Amino acid sequence: MNPGYTKYIPFQPQKIEGRTWPDHVITKAPVWCSVDLRDGNQALVDPMNLQEKLEYFHTLIDIGVKEIEIGFPSASETEYEICRELIEGGHIPDDVTIQVLVQAREHLIKKTFEAIKGAKNVILHFYNSTSTLQRKVVFHMDMEGITKIATDAADLIYEMSQPMIQEGMNLRFEYSPESFMGTEMDYAVDICQAVLEHLHATPENKVILNLPTTVENCMPNQFADMLEYFCRKLPSRDCAIISLHPHNDRGCGVATAEMGLLAGAERVEATLFGNGERTGNVDMVTLAMNMWTQGVDPELDFSNINKIKDMYERCTKMPVGDRQPYAGKLVFTAFSGSHQDAINKGTQYMKESGSDFWEIPYLPIDPADVGREYEPIIRINSQSGKGGAAYIMEHNFGFDLPKAMHPEFGHIVQVETDAVGKEITPERINELFHQEYVDVKEPYKLLKHAFQESVDNEGHSHVTFWGTLQHTDTIFKVSGEGNGPIDAFFNAIKGEKMARFSFLDYSSHAITDGSDSQGVAYILLKDQRDGKEYWGVGLSHNINLAPLRAILSAINRAKRE
């Protein structure tokens, strides 16, 4: 066995007594802050240009995001110019706050204040690294030295902010102890409390304390313990808004955010579809729609997810995965036969019950809620079952196959998928249905027919059938009587070497509406010689002709064997 795992130091959980967060429930949306234009953009192979950033920015506004981190204006001239364009170009609605990021360094802070001049609502977000590893490996400083970096920056920011605030700018502050996950909790409390004091935070003018999982290095429940401990110990908790900034290195970004909200956080910084450094930031779409499925309004609009996804892929040049929650191409698709059958039954239940609640197995959300369609839900491959093909025929083409017919047609479709070794389209399934049941015109074909109905003295109906049939090259006439058109036709053909078939089942329905409506009939016959059963299907605009064609379809299928 590879012993490489021995070089890693296990995460040491924060000890906490009487934790309460597991008993909490998310009942309202957090404050959302998009960091797509900073964290997301810096992680792209080809960062967005100005026009792409503007398109992305306006999409975030349409979604309903009220706090948007637009960049790091002191980092480069490009970032600075984008900030100025957003402000001077009138792109920022009055109810939207832009957020700018800056390191806790004097010259960068001063440049940032130049960049935000003229803006109405601004969050100035500054940070420095506080973790044990960063102090030891990067900064070679003790806790006191790291704290001084943060408080010196806080003093400068507070001083420079006062003239802008007096001129009418709604300027708020945010501080991040970067690498919070790797910081001793008591020290994290101390440095954040010091920053709150130097920024003169009050319950009326709260400071955002953003506690990032800069690199995700523990389980989500362990992070929640840390967060609850931090909130308990922070002296000026009422002067702070606790914000989360999860990354996804362990694949637990969404869980970390959700448990963090349970533990006391009120705000989340996230990106669309989880774009960001390494494995990405927490996905705003997944987090918001998870709340939606629990009956909580996320206060974000993802009702046209495909439009949002198209914008994202165009601007970032990054694909959204087929299995991406809520947005991927295949997330509302079922290949498994048992899943298809359950979805079909759930759909029928919803129609019949008129329930106000979403109760369809294997679909945690109504696809229509994100602007998706029902049609592609069930897909057919070699793993699909009897119900899937029938579902496709009903929902794509209007054929409501009798339940007893599902296994037979499902097997026909499965033979095809096994042969081609891949998924087959609804159109191909429809072709197979017609080839097997509808377009079966040999050896028997009905050329002409007529009915005459009479009523006896007791009010009983009697129907007489006359018709011309063709059997290979032979044309012959038949006639028969019965208590209805189907019975009369069946009696008429019994004398033509078809007496061995007995009638078992019949159903019909319309598949189109209006004066030009078309009907379909399903007939099940039994061959008395060997007991085998055969389904037949007939289509016609004539309500009396469809079942006759279905009977001949069943007989022709029997003769074909």
List PLM regions with ranges.
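N-terminal capping/small domains of soluble enzymes
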Residues: 1-108, 372, 377-380, 384, ...
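Catalytic alpha/beta core domains of metabolic enzymes, predominantly
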Residues: 218-352
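Alpha/beta enzyme core
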Residues: 2-8, 32, 48-67, 83-89, ...
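Positively charged, aromatic-enriched nucleic acid-contacting surfaces
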Residues: 463-469, 511-535
